[in-house]
């Protein structure tokens, strides 16, 4: 799926992906308005992850919260597999890393 991400979000997405992969995430996904195209002023960046080592979620979430220009909503798909399955079924999740 080709995403048309507005420039103001691109650097945060790349930085978040790199941080999450460096912290051990096996997979990083985008979902929400940046995937559906329903972007509004002030939209956040919805990121889903799989395979983050135990005990690291709140550490990386706080780093994303304080280090990024845009608000990041981080969801652990390992803990929310039904949510991931629903997004995947309707085609509103894209793996980015």
Predicted regions and their residues:
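Catalytic core of pol beta-like nucleotidyltransferases
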Residues: 1-29, 35-41, 52-97
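Periplasmic OmpA-like peptidoglycan-binding domain that tethers envelope proteins to the cell wall
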Residues: 43-45
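Short hydrophobic/aromatic beta-strand micro-patches
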Residues: 48-50
């Amino acid at each position: 799926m080709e995403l048309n991400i507005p420039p103001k979000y691109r650097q945060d997405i790349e930085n978040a992906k790199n941080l999450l992969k460096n912290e051990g995430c096996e997979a990083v996904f985008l979902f929400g308005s940046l995937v559906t195209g329903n972007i509004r002023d002030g939209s956040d960046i919805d990121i889903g992850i799989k395979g983050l080592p135990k005990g690291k979620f709140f550490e990386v979430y706080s780093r994303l919260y304080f280090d990024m220009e845009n608000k990041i909503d981080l969801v652990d798909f390992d803990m929310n597999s039904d949510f991931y399955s629903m997004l995947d079924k309707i085609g509103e999740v894209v793996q980015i890393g």
